[in-house]
Design a protein with these regions (language model features):
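Extended two-metal-dependent nuclease catalytic cores across DNA- and RNA-processing enzymes
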Residues: 2-5, 9, 15, 54, ...
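Domain-level signal for Mg2+-assisted phosphodiester chemistry and nucleotide/NA-binding surfaces
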Residues: 2-107
């Protein structure tokens, strides 16, 4: 099933929208050592859609991040170093995992929309759609990801559920997850950086200090 941005939301959708962070969710099975997970993945996604009254499911997949690397060549360079240290067995298992993820996307395409564009990351796709919910005629959107960077997109119509913590993050419980206001999220990330993506912050400024500076 294929939907372009131009046709998304036409005809008027039924229910809410579910945006799935494709690879992020797949790592749930990798961490469990499961390499045959495509059917479990599909069932999980459809179960979540039912829970959140989502009539439309969109699975987003990474297509690279060339424009980010053009700005910061060191972006995610730490991950290459990590993979370079893999043993032959780990390399084999990772290749098998990625192959199964590809099979999973193929399976999901039979019933749902899978969006992947060259040079665009999954969260870029999620950002574009979630910021244009009215244009696409959706009332609410639930993002499925354990990546807290996606919290930048949260507003009164957009929320996130983590399959790792099994917790929801919304505008209504924001203060249960963070010690600063929702509109200060970008400032917080600029101050602290992102170790996972190898993005530096202000030297000597950790999360606690960042919150103090924003008060």
């Amino acid at each position: 099933m294929a939907i372009s941005f131009s046709s998304l939301g036409d005809p008027a959708p039924i229910g809410n929208l579910l945006i799935v962070d494709g690879l992020n969710i797949a790592f749930r099975w990798k961490h469990q050592g499961v390499l045959d997970f495509k059917y479990d993945y599909a069932r999980t996604v459809e179960s979540l859609a039912k829970s959140y009254n989502a009539g439309t499911i969109i699975i987003t997949a990474d297509g690279g991040s060339s424009y980010r690397k053009a700005i910061l060549p060191e972006y995610k360079a730490n991950r290459k170093e990590k993979y370079a240290e893999q043993t032959p067995q780990e390399e084999k298992e990772f290749a098998m995992f990625m192959a199964e993820f590809s099979n999973t996307l193929t399976l999901l395409k039979e019933k749902h929309t899978v969006l992947q564009f060259k040079g665009v990351e999954a969260d870029d796709i999620a950002a574009y759609i979630s910021m244009n919910l009215d244009k696409f005629n959706f009332d609410e959107c639930w993002m499925i990801s354990s990546d807290r960077d996606w919290d930048l997109l949260i507003n009164d119509k957009v929320s996130r559920f983590s399959t790792v913590t099994r917790k929801e993050t919304t505008v209504h419980n924001w203060d249960e997850h963070y010690d600063f206001e929702i509109e200060d999220y970008i400032t917080f990330k600029c101050l602290t950086g992102d170790k996972g993506d190898n993005v530096p912050g202000i030297p000597g400024v950790g999360p606690k200090r960042a919150v103090q500076l924003m008060e």
